């Protein structure tokens, strides 16, 4: 059984037991969180697709950690002008473990 959820402006395909890094949400480590924006639920050949969301479906997860991704470098370079700009960015994430899918 798997589901497609929407959180943080992105969509994730999740199964029970998966550990997923999503955009940061303000929930303490060890607490449970419910995702009610479920786009699709599939159980074998039984597939339910929402338009755009499924009513009554939800995915529950446990927060494992809050952290930051690896640093990415942003470089702006102007040729022949002896000008360049370099910047780094580390995006915050929340790691969650999917504990249940209902729907």
From Swiss-Prot:
Superkingdom of source: Bacteria
Complex and partners: Part of the 50S ribosomal subunit. Contacts protein L20.
Family: Belongs to the bacterial ribosomal protein bL21 family.
The UniProt record lists the keyword Oxidoreductase: no
One GO MF term: rRNA binding
Any one Gene Ontology cellular component term annotated for this protein: ribonucleoprotein complex
Pfam families: Ribosomal_L21p
Gene name for this UniProt entry: rplU
UniProt protein name: Large ribosomal subunit protein bL21
Taxonomic lineage from the root: Bacteria, Pseudomonadati, Pseudomonadota, Gammaproteobacteria, Oceanospirillales
GO process terms (BP): translation
Function text: This protein binds to 23S rRNA in the presence of protein L20.
Disulfide bonds, paired cysteine numbers: none
UniProt source species: Alcanivorax borkumensis (strain ATCC 700651 / DSM 11573 / NCIMB 13689 / SK2)
Keywords recorded for this protein, A-Z: Ribonucleoprotein, Ribosomal protein, RNA-binding, rRNA-binding
Cross-referenced HAMAP family: Ribosomal_bL21
């Amino acid at each position: 059984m798997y589901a497609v959820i929407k959180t943080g402006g992105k969509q994730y395909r999740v199964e029970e037991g998966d550990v997923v890094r999503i955009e940061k949400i303000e929930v303490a480590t060890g607490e449970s969180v419910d995702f009610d924006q479920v786009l699709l639920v599939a159980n074998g050949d039984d597939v339910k697709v929402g338009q755009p969301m499924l009513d009554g479906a939800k995915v529950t997860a446990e927060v494992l950690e809050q952290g930051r991704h690896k640093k990415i470098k942003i470089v702006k370079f102007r040729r022949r002008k002896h000008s360049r700009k370099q910047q780094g960015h580390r995006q915050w994430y929340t790691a969650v473990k999917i504990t249940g899918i209902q729907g």
